[in-house]
Amino acid sequence: MGRSPCCEKAHMNKGAWTKEEDQLLVDYIRKHGEGCWRSLPRAAGLQRCGKSCRLRWMNYLRPDLKRGNFTEEEDELIIKLHSLLGNKWSLIAGRLPGRTDNEIKNYWNTHIKRKLLSRGIDPNSHRLINESVVSPSSLQNDVVETIHLDFSGPVKPEPVREEIGMVNNCESSGTTSEKDYGNEEDWVLNLELSVGPSYRYESTRKVSVVDSAESTRRWGSELFGAHESDAVCLCCRIGLFRNESCRNCRVSDVRTH
């Protein structure tokens, strides 16, 4: 079973204290000390609970309590301690001898708050009111700035393309894109230890020579009226051949070039 509430007993006085009750409490504590606040009221002859006797003694009847208004030095000390400790009034009262936590709290709410507001200082944050209150325009600017920073990213650099198989280029890089390679059959590296055109260049040149020889043969046939059995070659020399379509001439042209 827990403790029974001290103020729910029958025949307990509640409300303001009378002078006679104050005198009884002071006389008992001076003679016997504070002791146990739960058993003190019955020993002192008071119809009060222990909590009420303790608060009456601590806040009003102690002999070391200061009477009168707070001084300017006490005001500045309370402001400084409040900026460090916040609303911990019991700790603040421990730094001010003769002042109670309840007295300091009431004095803060009735006097010091107004003094700070008149100076343009927020009593909760102890900062200037202009700095603590943010205007709607500044909030809008912050939102726009944040959106701009979130959605704007760095420009991606373009991939570097380097050609492979250039004759006059002496330097090459190891990184190329997929478009540079193309098909596997399109690029064939010439690994022979010789200086000359690449395989692609040679094959292209052979095709162009064969096409030119073929066009020349057809033009000669039409000009001299030759039949299919006789072919006229005007590439290197003029002569008649047997249904060979100037094959030897084309091969010799490719080799000489």
Swiss-Prot record:
Major localisation: nucleus
Q: Where in the cell is it found?
A: Nucleus
Q: Which UniProt keywords apply?
A: DNA-binding, Nucleus, Repeat, Transcription, Transcription regulation
Entry coiled-coil feature ranges: none
Q: Does the keyword Repeat apply?
A: yes
Q: Where is this motif: Required for interaction with CPL1?
A: 189-193
Which residues does UniProt assign to DNA binding? Answer: 37-61, 89-112
Q: Which Gene Ontology terms cover its molecular function? A: DNA-binding transcription factor activity; transcription cis-regulatory region binding
Q: Which SMART domains match?
A: SANT
Its tissue distribution reads: Expressed in roots, stems, leaves, flowers and siliques.
Q: Which domain of life is it from?
A: Eukaryota
| UniProt record, GO biological process | cinnamic acid biosynthetic process; negative regulation of metabolic process; response to wounding
Assembly, in brief, is: Interacts with CPL1.
**Record-given protein name:** Transcription factor MYB3
